[in-house]
């Protein structure tokens, strides 16, 4: 999912990719290919920069920790669904967005929905 977000950012005239946070070896290759900094964790990123916004496309079990860290830093988050792997964690994420008065958007794409896919066939 992260790669799809990167492609969308690259096509945008309103956004740019600042950096990547990734612990896997693929992150090294990707950051070199895209010519953007790579960080091994969020703590290092936040010590050096404050992004305008972030996209979190990590394994579900990491959603709470990662999202809350950015929200506490007042950084808006686009979080890929599901919001979390359990209700308690989901509530913590939502409460963090509210208490920090910071935007939280849950990504819910419809790229496999036939109705959405056929919208391009309509000529208005």
PLM features: residue spans?
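Rossmann-fold dehydrogenase core element
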Residues: 92-110
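Acidic-histidine catalytic/liganding microenvironments
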Residues: 12-14, 48, 113
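N-terminal Rossmann-like dinucleotide-binding module
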Residues: 1-34
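Beta-loop-alpha module in the N-terminal Rossmann-like domain of NAD(P)-dependent dehydrogenases
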Residues: 5, 37-96
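Short active-site oxyanion
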Residues: 15-19, 52-54, 104
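Active-site Tyr-X1-5-Lys
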Residues: 117-118
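Conserved small/polar residues in nucleotide/adenosyl-binding loops
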Residues: 122-124
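Short helix-capping segments at alpha-helix termini
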Residues: 13-14, 73, 98-102
């Amino acid at each position: 999912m992260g790669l799809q977000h990167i492609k969308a950012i690259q096509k945008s005239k309103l956004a740019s990719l600042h950096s990547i946070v990734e612990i896997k070896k693929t992150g090294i290759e990707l950051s070199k290919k895209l010519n953007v900094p790579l960080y091994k964790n969020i703590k290092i990123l936040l010590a050096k920069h404050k992004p305008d916004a972030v996209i979190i496309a990590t394994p579900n079990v990491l959603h709470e920790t990662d999202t809350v860290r950015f929200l506490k830093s007042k950084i808006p988050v686009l979080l890929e669904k599901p919001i979390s792997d359990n209700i308690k964690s989901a509530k913590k994420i939502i409460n963090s967005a509210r208490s920090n008065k910071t935007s939280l958007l849950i990504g819910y794409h419809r790229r496999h929905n036939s109705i959405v896919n056929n919208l391009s066939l309509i000529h208005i």
